[in-house]
Amino acid sequence: MSGRNVFKMGFLSAVAATGLFMASNSFAADSHTTSKFEGVKANTGMATHGRQGNNDTLTWSDEFKIPDTPAPHWQVVDSKGNVFLLQRLKIKGDKENRTITIPSYVHDIAKVQIYCAWAEALLGEASFAKPVMTASGEHMHSNSMAMGR
């Protein structure tokens, strides 16, 4: 192998490594984790926000235990204090809504709560360090910036 080929291989390897590093950082930037759930019934685990394309998701951690209540649900609170009741944690056939897609009408998420819809009681909550902007919120924000020009 000539010196020129060795140089090309080394250079291409460095470019590939840089690309992989940048790609992994961009994926990590779209993932946010809450504090630990704290409450009367939900007090283990955390929730993670992720994004797949234009869909925002919430997933609970492996440590999370579904509270033993009649109708525990996902619930989120935005930075303005608006509360959005979302899917049940347990569904038919002993299945679980471990990951849910956030509806487009939710523009940011400050807190993730576990709520019992039957008893109308908050079972526990976890907060993000700062509110997480959803894809629909980013779209609204960019449109309002364009209108202000």
Locations of the language-model features?
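An anionic, turn-rich surface loop/hairpin at beta-sheet edges
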Residues: 80-107
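N-terminal signal peptide c-region/cleavage motif recognized by signal peptidases
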Residues: 23-25
